[in-house]
Amino acid sequence: MSKDKKMVEVRTYNWGPCLIKLKIQDDFKKILIDEAAKNEKDFSDKLAGQIRKETGYSEESRNKIIPFLSPYLGIYDKMFEKYQTKKFDRKPEYALTALWANFQRQYEFNPPHDHDGKLSFVIYLSIPEPLKKENEAYKGKSCGPGGIQFMYGDGIRDNISYVSHFPEEGDMFIFPAWLKHWVCPYSTDCVRVSVS
């Protein structure tokens, strides 16, 4: 390029929902597991999943979990401001109105769905080794067995309309509650545990 030619200034724009992925600390993971063991409420009638065991956390458990969850919501707020390239007029306030654990087994799945409220998340507590191997052997282009896929838009060509991910233990996604997502079934005889 000759010295007298100017560089073209280019800017790309973020488009669609703000979706973030991060790793939770071990103490947060531990309290989610410990409190899930106390869950007695069947949550299946409130959820879209084709999953036999979906249990709700009690209000007492949710109150224990909030101090662990709050810093991650703060991270989301900062990332959202960066994503929007503007500061909040007023810092968002959140209420943990529901919390449940999904104990997904062989052939079970979560069809495309969204969540109630304004903001939501999913945290992965257990991804068994045989499921990891099944996913590694998968040859398709979707999220594969036991994976999660977030969808936005009409699927127009030359447009990114989904994000696929095979989770690891401790992964956390935070996203607008209206963002559609789904979970693929798998054939391995094991239990994959997530919390939302």
What are these model-derived regions, one by one?
Residues 2-100, 104-110:
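Non-heme Fe(II)/2-oxoglutarate
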Residues 181:
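Glycine-rich nucleotide phosphate-binding loop and flanking beta-alpha elements
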Residues 194:
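A domain-level signal for the structural core that forms small-molecule/cofactor-binding pockets
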